[in-house]
Amino acid sequence: MVRYNPNEIEPRWQAYWDEHHTFATPEKVGKKKRYVLDMFPYPSGDGLHVGHPEGYTATDIVSRFARARGESVLHPMGFDAFGLPAEEHAIKTGEHPRVQTQRNIDNFTRQLKMLGFSYDWDRVLATTDEEYFRWTQWIFGVLYDTWFDHDQQKGRPISELPIPAEVTAEGELEIEQYRDSKRLAYLDDALVNWCPKLGTVLANEEVVDGKSEVGGHPVKRIPLRQWMLRITDYAERLLDGLDDLDWPTGIKKLQSDWIGRSTGGEVDFYLQRGAAGDDTGPFVAFKRARESEGFPTDPGKDCLRVYTTRPDTLFGATYMVVAPEHPLIDVLVKPEQKDEVDAYREKASFKSDRERTDGDRAKTGVFTGSYAINPADGRSIPIWVADYVLAGYGTGAIMAVPAHDERDFEFAVAFDLPVIPVVDPPADHKQREEILAGKACFAAEGVAINSGEYDGKTTAEVKAALTAELAKQGLACEAVNYKLRDWLFSRQRFWGEPFPVLHEIDSEGNATGVRRLVPDDQLPVTLPELADFKPHGRPEPPLAKADDDWLIVELDGKRYRRETNTMPQWAGSCWYYLRYIDPKNSDALIDPQKEKDWMPVDLYVGGAEHAVLHLLYSRFWHKVLFDRGHVTCPEPFGKLVNQGMILGEVEFTSFVDPSGKHVSTKDVKKDAEGNRVHKATGEQVEIVSLTEEQVVKKGEGFVLASDASIKVDSRAFKMSKSRGNVVNPDSVVRDYGADSLRLYEMFMGPLEATKPWAMNGVGGVRSFLDRVWRMIIDEPEDELKVSDAVVDTACDEEQLRVLHQTIRKVTEDNEAMSFNTAIAKMMEFTNHFTRCETRPREAMESFLILLAPYAPHMCEELWKHLGHNESISLQPWPKWDEAALVQSSIEIPVQINGKVKAKISLSPDAKPNEMGEAALADPAVQNAIGDKKVVKTIAVPGRMVNLVVK
């Protein structure tokens, strides 16, 4: 007996596709193109788990579907291969990161090919390939050579930057320093998350509870000279560009919130030189100077500048707060406060931004000993340092209005600071009396109180009037602010792209302050060979240990020292979609005509965890390349789809009391210490795991199979090695086949939904494929033979209708990426035709073309056995005939007094009176009525006829 054997079939067809380059991208793009892209994976040592293929299968279906419809398809794959895990492995084992990375890439490639994805493997790339990161370095050079013209709202060559006359008069070095201050890529002292153990700077997202996400090592905030990218110059365009993108609304909102545009005002608070109330005279002089000179770009050291979205609440500012890293800290802190402030700042340096801004944290802070003057009313207010204010947002200082800001209110309560309400809430507000008494916070808009001449005006009116008045005095100006910060772009690690930057040094080896790019013809700058990759434990990159042969460069008669930081992992993933289009071009980033033919990406699929940073950074780089004329479209990704997470299998747990008796989940609570106890007895209960055989479904939940009164807990968790619920696709493919895995992941539910893995579900899909096999292949034979039921005959009317309904449904569902419902329709088709004594070949062949994007290996095999030599992947997509969808007649039941007595055939368009007449004319109905009288006829078009007789 010859059965469906995927372990024999699948490797054979994978080899066929490789040998024949079945999925090679066409050199000449046709009338319609489809660029389908997966977010490429980091090649970890663990390989793929079953969550990875979900998105890959979806894009593979789209790609195969598009090819069948005659579209030119680009569907590539590659690897985001730089990264800290490989370097950590190298430090532990001494094995070069390149060796482990290539081993992991080979394993990923094996697994991806094992799953039958129709990638163009001739275009595969890795960000660690020297020929690839040569162009990553080249793009950095473009960023370095670009400044942002705010008038034109675009990036321009640095050579076109207007140089002020006073700078020109200072000389060439000053001119170069002025250019450096405007470049999109620049050096700056930045507060960074420094991890001594890892020996590198970490992004905020890589720090969890003050420790590194990788390894759990302590992280400290320190100032460090870093490469930065001026992404903030593009904030407005990054925000505006979201409007035209076919992206999930939630993802757009995440990006919008990350950019965080707000409007308000910048306000300067004059710093008192003495104790509170001592600076009336100097303050008056300061105000006179400001009235004549206006609001300066740089506030200097006489003021604390704040940004506020609520200038209307200035009269309610009762204290100020500066971030622990504020540049004026040393000016503000009085000698008697220094030790306390220093200790506080040191403690704050070990906290991440997330920790510091956690709303549930108790507020902490220290008084600096200094005061500032509120420009609205001339009051002296104290200046505190507190870690809930971040140096990177706004100006790093705030005016604290505890009556109308929740964080400020909590701080004021903690340190017994005054609360002055200046906005009257609506009369029907539940807490109005407490708010007006300074006992509660009100953050919304209202009517001004305790605000001098502005009393009685609305929030909007006070904002406009007070900002205008202070602007006239040179103490404020309207401002737009963004939460988005410039991108910290350098890392103190080995396994990353070297910067193509040279620092000039004098004869003593000291830096002169002059920098230049490595010439294009000397790219790529490759990594040096190092004896070890261990970090120093101090902020000095591993590349600084390189031999002088690599480190020191002579160029045009001058000596230079290479930049020893490396780029972050984000760098290579910012532009890989472009290189896929022209991966072997050694003369240019991309051929202009090919870029024009293929861009933008038509469909981009990946996890929502990349919603903010990767997508934002890619869009930023792309816009710079667009401004500089290297690409022709302003956005890289037209349509974005986020696949949902596949969780581990559902886990069942129950509780048992000390006697071992099961306790229902509804009868358990947590006590004050967090222990789970029986609600009635107070006895502590223990969690026990249950097998699937020990539970049964009841309503929306599960209960014990042995006692239906005991409700059990059922939930699925994210797959992780620590939980032991990771499912390896290798074992699934071995036991069920790749087609079963692909089909199951698409059948689990909507692509975007989060859903739990269930191995019995894979078995169910495998059973469906077995039925498809038996529908075409005669299994009882000793040799593989097409079933005698498959014949060269035309479909009957019903078969034709089922076929064309299936073609239409699968086509429309493929277009909508509703793959689960397409599969359900193909299951209906199979159920119908397996009941047919004859199965027309045209129906079987059309069905296989529909199923092929989902289960390509099996369909190739069946297609071959139906007598075809050419791959099913090259066959045109079937089209449905609207006429075939229409039934010429339908069969409906005829009831007499509610009981079915006969069935009649009639037109689906028959009207109620025609249905009644046809029913009465049927002999079986006449016989059932006998001598009784029909007193009422009820006809439901297309459904049934009911005759009421007496």
UniProtKB/Swiss-Prot annotation:
Motif residue range(s): 'KMSKS' region: 718-722
Keywords noted in UniProt: Aminoacyl-tRNA synthetase, ATP-binding, Cytoplasm, Ligase, Nucleotide-binding, Protein biosynthesis
InterPro entries: aa-tRNA-synth_I_CS (IPR001412), aa-tRNA-synth_Ia (IPR002300), Leu-tRNA-ligase (IPR002302), Leu_tRNA-synth_edit (IPR025709), M/V/L/I-tRNA-synth_anticd-bd (IPR013155), Rossmann-like_a/b/a_fold (IPR014729), tRNAsynth_Ia_anticodon-bd (IPR009080), Val/Leu/Ile-tRNA-synth_edit (IPR009008)
Main localization category: cytoplasm
Gene3D superfamilies, per the entry: HUPs (3.40.50.620), Isoleucyl-tRNA Synthetase, Domain 1 (1.10.730.10), Valyl/Leucyl/Isoleucyl-tRNA synthetase, editing domain (3.90.740.10)
EC number annotated for this UniProt entry: 6.1.1.4
The UniProt record lists the keyword Metal-binding: no
GO biological process, one term: leucyl-tRNA aminoacylation
Enzymatic reactions: tRNA(Leu) + L-leucine + ATP = L-leucyl-tRNA(Leu) + AMP + diphosphate
Record carries keyword Transferase: no
GO MF term list: aminoacyl-tRNA deacylase activity; ATP binding; leucine-tRNA ligase activity
Subcellular compartments: Cytoplasm
Residues at which ATP binds: K721
Residues spanned by motif 'HIGH' region: 41-52
A GO cellular component annotation in the UniProt record: cytosol
Family recorded in the similarity comment: Belongs to the class-I aminoacyl-tRNA synthetase family.
UniProt protein name: Leucine--tRNA ligase
Source organism of the structure: Rhodopirellula baltica (strain DSM 10527 / NCIMB 13988 / SH1)
Gene designation per UniProt: leuS
